[in-house]
From Swiss-Prot:
InterPro entries: Ribosom_uL1_bac-type (IPR005878), Ribosomal_uL1 (IPR002143), Ribosomal_uL1-like (IPR023674), Ribosomal_uL1/biogenesis (IPR028364), Ribosomal_uL1_3-a/b-sand (IPR016095), Ribosomal_uL1_CS (IPR023673)
PANTHER family xref list: 54S RIBOSOMAL PROTEIN L1, MITOCHONDRIAL, LARGE RIBOSOMAL SUBUNIT PROTEIN UL1M
Entry's Gene Ontology BP terms: regulation of translation; translation
Protein's name according to its UniProt entry: Large ribosomal subunit protein uL1
């Protein structure tokens, strides 16, 4: 632990805490100050001036990053008949119905994304207590409740990320790995920022993005100037 603390202190010393960096500078600095011994995830953190208690100010959705996330998602699809065959052909890792419900209720969770056709939601609903807390419950807003399973599976495999504001208006989204070229991370970051900016509720007054930073797994946060996009 002492070694990690020393590494973190050294990383923090490279960052000017009083400065908001341009997106390019911030991403490069986040990569430079990453000290994890594995290919750390690069994550963007927003604090938004919204009141999530109001239904018209909730921020939630999904998008496909232009350069992916660096992680191949394990996709599970609840579907039957022709749609099950379509999901398998699209590259889904697991496809089924009640047998998957039983397996998941038994403790199996070796998947990253859950997709369902609308007619299967009554079956999937039985997994609410398991999937809900893990943000794995299929939802129309994120494109995971759909009849177009080919598109849903393809997007999930291509680097689709979900975003959702918590009770304090914070949104955390991974944009890639430290091993990515800085340019690719910046491109992902800018694509994400375009989506988040466009999601501003009409009822949100004043500054919308009140704080923005980029960080890596275990690494320090680097403040980003939202006007640099």
């Amino acid at each position: 632990m002492a070694k990690k603390s020393k590494a973190l202190r050294a990383a923090i010393e490279k960052i000017d805490a009083t400065k908001a960096y341009s997106v390019e500078e911030a991403v490069a600095l986040a990569k430079e100050t990453s000290f994890a011994k594995f290919d750390a995830t690069v994550e963007v953190a927003y604090n938004l001036n919204i009141d999530v208690k109001k239904s018209d100010q909730q921020i939630r959705g999904a998008m496909v990053l232009p350069n992916g996330t660096g992680k191949t998602a394990r996709v599970l699809v609840f579907a039957k008949g022709a749609k099950a065959e379509e999901a398998t052909a699209a590259g889904a890792d697991f496809v089924g119905s009640d047998e998957l419900v039983a397996k998941i209720n038994g403790g199996w969770l070796d998947f990253d994304v859950v997709i369902a056709t609308p007619d299967m939601m009554a079956v999937v609903g039985r997994l609410g207590r398991v999937l809900g807390p893990r943000n794995l419950m299929p939802n129309p807003k994120t494109g995971t409740v759909t009849m177009d399973v080919t598109k849903a599976v393809g997007e999930s495999k291509a680097g689709k990320v979900n975003y959702r504001a918590d009770k304090a208006g914070n949104v955390h989204v991974p944009i890639g790995k430290v091993s990515f070229d800085t340019e690719k991370l910046v491109e992902n970051f800018k694509a994400l920022n375009t989506v988040i900016a466009a999601a501003k509720p009409a009822a949100s007054k004043g500054a919308y993005i009140t704080n923005l930073s980029v960080t890596t797994t275990m690494g320090p946060g680097v403040k980003v100037d939202s006007a640099s996009f």
